Amino acid sequence: MAAAKDGCGLETAAGNGRRLHLGIPEAVFVEDVDSFMKQPGNETADTVLKKLDEQYQKYKFMELNLAQKKRRLKGQIPEIKQTLEILKYMQKKKESTNSMETRFLLADNLYCKASVPPTDKVCLWLGANVMLEYDIDEAQALLEKNLSTATKNLDSLEEDLDFLRDQFTTTEVNMARVYNWDVKRRNKDDSTKNKA
């Protein structure tokens, strides 16, 4: 199946408009356990259960990674919003000749008082120990773009986590169906041995 990237950098399946979920493999529901167990590679219930358990563990690992990304984004979004509010305040004050009194964070629970003269330049931390100077308007545009991207990514992560939960459920149901099939088969074998 061919895939194309949409405007957010998210992959959509060609033709049906469905979004692929970050390369998460879709768990296929086992309708007919008898025919499924006759397929090559499914010789015993134990091997099938082992494969399904491996798939389940992979889904759990993916969930852990997505949850970490979600936590990080949920922390970044309020920071970006707060910085945007500060920039808007500085935009209003840049025409004034009065200095702006503020407190800034030096370390956890340690603030320092400062007097900031009117300015049209700000420095933004971009990450990886990189700070760049921007005009207030440029900084505001950059942060608004970053906020939009972070919000879209958070929505995408929510969808991927929902999709992943569906895969958990499907895999768990498949494991239960294969296990029950094996129990029935063994009971049937035991009853035929007892009759003989």
UniProtKB/Swiss-Prot annotation:
Keyword Chloroplast listed: no
GO molecular function terms noted in the UniProt entry: amyloid-beta binding; unfolded protein binding
Sorted UniProt keywords: Acetylation, Chaperone, Cytoplasm, Nucleus
Record bears the keyword Transferase: no
N6-acetyllysine PTM sites in chain numbering: 58
A cellular component annotation (GO) from this entry: prefoldin complex
Pfam families referenced in this protein's UniProt entry, alphabetically: Prefoldin
Modified residues annotated as N-acetylalanine in this record: 2
Assembly and interaction partners: Heterohexamer of two PFD-alpha type and four PFD-beta type subunits. Binds to the C-terminal part of VHL.
Descriptive protein name: Prefoldin subunit 3
Organism: Mus musculus (Mouse)
